[in-house]
Amino acid sequence: MKPRLLFALAAALLAGGCGSDVGIDVASEPKLETDPALLDAALECTPFANTDKPPVLLVHGTFTHGQEQFNWNYKPLLIERGFDVCTVTYPDRGLGDQQVSAEYIVHALRRIHAESGRKVAMIGHSQGALMPRWALKWWPSARAAVEDFVLLAGPNHGTLVAATDNPLGAMVGSTLGLPAAFYQFARGSSFIGALNAGDETPGDVDYTNIYTLFDELVQPVVPEPTAALEFGEDNPKVANILLQDVCPLLIVDHLTIGLTDRATFELALDAITHVGPANVERAGGAALCHALPPLPGIALPPNFLFEMLALLPIEIENGAPGLHLVRAEPPLKPYAQ
């Protein structure tokens, strides 16, 4: 059966209250406003063949897209370890309204769950850690499709270095405008407030938050890290891991935590291969701090260069990403008010 047909049938069953998620009425959830063809085109998956492991959805950060960020690191390494892997690319390199970008995550999770018949392990970096939480908060069908969520350097409570929180950024925003997503990164934004109101970790999902002292973009890290969820509450389904608590001499910044850091990868791998969130000792403990290559056996896949070259005409045809310049934070969608 063709995957699209399989997805359509599974979605129909799900909407009718049948299938693996009994009781979830998709029709009662916030309606996805994005063109379904765009949502479909944004998702790329390997065949769903490894039934003993959860399929993994990789979610990129701001200024990049799924293939650029993951096709040379996490994706081949996870495939090598027997995982089915998907990447999703939300619009305009993450510059637009994150409420819109979250619809791409909702659709991806529903589709992967329906086509694979398994719950999904999601790994996201930066905005790709923050924004999918919006999908999990407001769409029960998205929550029901996920068993693990690994968040790498996610500004979960906003960041002190948001462009709108400094005089120059505020001036530029009020005159020329700033990308919509930039306003939503601020600690006092309506987006952050709505996201963290009530349960920060909804659903039967294990959450692993990994962050670093040397993150120049997601601040503060101490005394209470903005990347952490339910910090200090001892929730058994949540692990908040500061890399320097594991490896005191490890220097990892905002970019490398989501691209090349070995300890981060091993902790993420531990989370998605065991029940519960990541466990530092089980993942290797002090051994994660030894002189190791940035990622285990990392090497550019032979076809990586050709894949990137194949993207060029598509990028040229699509033109420059929309900047989504606005002079104020986008209003909250009605379902979040």
Where are these regions (language model features)?
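Bacterial N-terminal signal peptides that target proteins for export
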Residues: 1-7
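C-terminal motif of bacterial Sec signal peptides marking the signal peptidase cleavage site
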Residues: 14-17
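Active-site catalytic motif of lipid deacylating hydrolases and related acyltransferases
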Residues: 22-33, 44-119, 167, 177, ...
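Extracellular/periplasmic catalytic domains that process cell-envelope and extracellular macromolecules
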Residues: 48-52, 79-80, 114-116, 123, ...
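Serine-dependent carboxylesterase/thioesterase catalytic core
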Residues: 56, 60, 99-199
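Active-site-proximal beta-strand/loop segments in catalytic clefts of secreted hydrolases
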Residues: 59-62, 83, 88-93, 125-127, ...
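Short aromatic-enriched loop/helix-cap "lid" or pocket-rim segments at secondary-structure transitions
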Residues: 70, 158-165, 219-224, 252-253
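C-terminal catalytic-base region of ester-bond hydrolases, centering on the histidine
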Residues: 203-337
